[in-house]
């Protein structure tokens, strides 16, 4: 199977595009996912990934680039969730659940209204083997931009992630960095939609980062390990999906889940935690 996969990479341009795109998404999703994990915003990541669906559908209806619609609706969902949480007795998880389910339902309706040739299944679950050259370069461009922003603003992002109260007292505008992270999350969600679809995007964001969290002792090392695991899961998932002729996006997610499952039992932090629990 490995030989066939390598031969396919040498012969088929679409497979080369798929591999490069998958690696790029794995790297950038792994990096952004670390901040999502540290901020306890896994549900927010799920909401944003679902919220881009109506934006994509509306973009098809209006004949504009789907990046524009997806980013607008991703930010709209973020603002709506924050507003509901800040101006009512409703807790954040409830606000997130209401918002993401509503946006997902709206997206399905808009796709039906658009009557486009775009397959709903591919939007929901991805089709990385259909990635074109322009999609690949756009993914790389977005990935480089997101990573550059993280590097340039690493310190305030780190501070607002670990201790927002301290950051506020130091004059850091916490809300601005919160919404900046939402922008980065939306960008990653839009690019990852091509590989795993809107349904499974959150797994690309959360699972490699959660696995890295079991090993890392600093945010930098966590980001590096998470991105590496994301890229490795993407490569192996593409190999398995292509070789067995099954859904590549799902293979990527399941490969990442296997990494986490193994780490859950062997990671040093986990062993220490189990030892501490057993001693009580």
UniProtKB/Swiss-Prot annotation:
Membrane topology label: Multi-pass membrane protein
Record-level GO BP terms: response to zinc ion; transmembrane transport
Keyword Cell membrane: yes
Primary location: membrane
Keyword annotations from UniProtKB, A to Z: Cell membrane, Membrane, Transmembrane, Transmembrane helix, Transport
Compartments, as annotated in UniProt: Cell membrane
Superkingdom in the source lineage: Bacteria
Keyword Transit peptide part of the UniProt annotation: no
GO cellular component, one term: ATP-binding cassette (ABC) transporter complex
CDD domains hit by this protein: TM_ABC_iron-siderophores_like
Transmembrane spans: 18-38, 61-81, 94-114, 139-159, 174-194, 196-216, 222-242, 246-266
Entries under Pfam families matching the protein: ABC-3
UniProt cross-references to Gene3D superfamilies, sorted A to Z: ABC transporter involved in vitamin B12 uptake, BtuC
Family listed: Belongs to the ABC-3 integral membrane protein family.
Function: Part of an ABC transporter complex involved in manganese import.
Name this polypeptide is given: Manganese import system permease protein ScaB
Organism expressing this protein natively: Streptococcus parasanguinis
């Amino acid at each position: 199977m490995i030989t066939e996969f390598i031969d396919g990479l040498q012969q088929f341009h679409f497979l080369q595009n798929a591999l490069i795109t998958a690696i790029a998404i794995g790297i950038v999703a792994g990096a952004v996912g670390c901040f999502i994990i540290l901020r306890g915003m896994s549900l927010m990541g799920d909401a944003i990934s679902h919220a881009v669906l109506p934006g994509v559908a509306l973009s098809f209806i209006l004949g504009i680039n789907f990046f524009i619609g997806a980013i607008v609706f991703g930010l709209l969902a973020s603002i709506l969730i924050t507003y509901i949480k800040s101006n009512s007795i409703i807790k954040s998880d409830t606000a997130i659940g209401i918002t993401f389910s509503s946006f997902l339902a709206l997206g399905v309706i808009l796709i039906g209204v658009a009557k486009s040739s775009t397959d709903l299944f591919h939007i929901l679950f991805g089709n990385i083997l259909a990635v074109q050259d322009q999609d690949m370069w756009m993914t790389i461009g977005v990935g480089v931009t997101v990573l550059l922003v993280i590097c340039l603003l690493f310190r305030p992002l780190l501070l607002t992630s670990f201790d927002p109260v301290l950051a506020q007292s130091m004059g850091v505008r916490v809300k601005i960095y919160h919404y900046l992270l939402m922008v980065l999350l939306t960008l990653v969600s839009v690019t990852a939609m091509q590989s795993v679809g809107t349904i499974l995007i959150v797994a690309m964001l959360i699972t490699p980062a959660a696995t890295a969290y079991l090993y890392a002792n600093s945010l930098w090392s966590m980001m590096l390990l998470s991105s590496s695991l994301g890229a490795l899961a993407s490569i192996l998932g593409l190999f398995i999906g292509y070789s067995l002729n099954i859904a590549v996006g799902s293979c990527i997610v399941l490969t990442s889940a296997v990494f986490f499952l193994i780490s859950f039992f062997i990671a040093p932090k986990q062993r220490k935690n189990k030892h501490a629990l057993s001693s009580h």
